[in-house]
């Protein structure tokens, strides 16, 4: 018997560096530094993509969009998310809900969370009420606490198509 529900967990980290735009959850956030990465380095969307792919048993973002492929250089992570989600849907799953935590000293996430929620809901074709985003600090501990980078953790619940009640 195939399980009607699948849970995926995603995690990502990127360093904050000068000279890059800061994009989190598809939102451009005014800040003096941005995230370093092969694509736009959207730490939240990368963790979400991993959570969705993992729940569906489809690997991870690095397998689908390797950083060794020049085609993904500077890529918009919302485009990557939509492509990954198309594979998840093709595997027979839809999203029930997403719960995410963005961990950083600065900038503050809460003022930008509604726009992030709207982007994710639109990209996944789900109600905004099914997406939750929290911002947390580590009380000045570790690399996020020192402001050296941003981390994100995401849990996603998928439901197999045809199992709707």
From Swiss-Prot:
Disulfide bridge partners, by residue number: none
Q: Which residues form the signal peptide?
A: none
- Which keywords annotate this record? Isoprene biosynthesis, Lyase, Metal-binding
Q: Which GO terms describe its molecular function?
A: 2-C-methyl-D-erythritol 2,4-cyclodiphosphate synthase activity; metal ion binding
> So which cofactors does this thing need?
a divalent metal cation
Q: SUPFAM superfamilies attached here?
A: IpsF-like
Among InterPro entries, the record links this protein to: MECDP_synthase (IPR003526), MECDP_synthase_CS (IPR020555), MECDP_synthase_sf (IPR036571)
Q: Where is this site: Transition state stabilizer?
A: 38, 137
| Catalytic activity reported | 4-CDP-2-C-methyl-D-erythritol 2-phosphate = 2-C-methyl-D-erythritol 2,4-cyclic diphosphate + CMP
The keyword Lyase is assigned to this record:
yes
Q: In which pathway does it act?
A: Isoprenoid biosynthesis; isopentenyl diphosphate biosynthesis via DXP pathway; isopentenyl diphosphate from 1-deoxy-D-xylulose 5-phosphate: step 4/6
**Sequence positions that bind 4-CDP-2-C-methyl-D-erythritol 2-phosphate:** 12-14, 38-39, 60-62, 65-69, 143, 146
Q: Which residues are listed for a divalent metal cation binding in this entry? A: 12, 14, 46
How many and how are cofactors bound here? Binds 1 divalent metal cation per subunit.
* Superkingdom as given in the UniProt entry: Bacteria
Q: Its Enzyme Commission number?
A: 4.6.1.12
Q: What class of enzyme is it?
A: lyase
Q: Which Gene Ontology BP terms does the record give?
A: isopentenyl diphosphate biosynthetic process, methylerythritol 4-phosphate pathway; terpenoid biosynthetic process
List the HAMAP family hit by this protein, alphabetically.
IspF (MF_00107)
What is stated as this protein's family in its record? Belongs to the IspF family.
What the protein does? Involved in the biosynthesis of isopentenyl diphosphate (IPP) and dimethylallyl diphosphate (DMAPP), two major building blocks of isoprenoid compounds. Catalyzes the conversion of 4-diphosphocytidyl-2-C-methyl-D-erythritol 2-phosphate (CDP-ME2P) to 2-C-methyl-D-erythritol 2,4-cyclodiphosphate (ME-CPP) with a corresponding release of cytidine 5-monophosphate (CMP).
Listed under subunit, the entry gives:
Homotrimer.
What this protein is called in its record is 2-C-methyl-D-erythritol 2,4-cyclodiphosphate synthase
> What organism does the UniProt record list as the source?
Aromatoleum aromaticum (strain DSM 19018 / LMG 30748 / EbN1)
Gene that encodes it: ispF
């Amino acid at each position: 018997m195939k399980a009607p529900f699948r849970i995926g967990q995603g995690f990502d980290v990127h360093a904050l560096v000068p000279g890059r735009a800061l994009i989190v959850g598809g939102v451009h956030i005014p800040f003096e530094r941005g995230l370093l990465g092969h694509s736009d380095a959207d730490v939240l969307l990368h963790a979400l993509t991993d959570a969705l792919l993992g729940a569906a048993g489809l690997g991870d973002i690095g397998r689908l969009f390797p950083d060794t492929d020049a085609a993904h250089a500077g890529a918009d992570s919302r485009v990557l998310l939509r492509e990954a989600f198309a594979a998840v849907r093709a595997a027979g799953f839809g999203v029930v809900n997403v719960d995410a935590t963005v961990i950083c000293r600065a900038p503050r996430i809460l003022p930008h969370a509604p726009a992030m929620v709207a982007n994710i809901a639109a990209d996944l074709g789900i109600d905004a009420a099914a997406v939750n985003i929290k911002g947390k600090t580590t009380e000045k501990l570790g690399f996020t606490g020192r402001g050296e980078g941003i981390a994100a953790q995401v849990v996603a619940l998928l439901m197999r198509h045809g199992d709707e009640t």
